UniProtKB/Swiss-Prot annotation:
A GO molecular-function descriptor: peptidase activator activity
Keywords (A to Z) from UniProt: Hydrolase, Protease, Prothrombin activator, Serine protease
EC main group: hydrolase
Family of the protein in this entry: Belongs to the peptidase S8 family.
Superkingdom to which the source organism belongs: Eukaryota
Activity over temperature: Optimum temperature is 55 degrees Celsius.
Coiled-coil regions listed: none
Task performed by this protein: Subtilisin-like serine protease. Cleaves prothrombin at 151-Ala-|-Met-152, 271-Arg-|-Thr-272 and 316-Tyr-|-Ile-317 to produce meizothrombin(desF1)-like molecules. Degrades fibrinogen. Inhibits plasma coagulation.
Activity-pH behavior: Optimum pH is 8.0.
Protein name, UniProt field: Subtilisin-like serine protease AS-E2
Amino acid sequence: AYVSQSGAPWGLGRISHK
């Protein structure tokens, strides 16, 4: 898991499990 940046469809500023 990691903190994704703004503009990412699989995150949008939140933590994703990709």
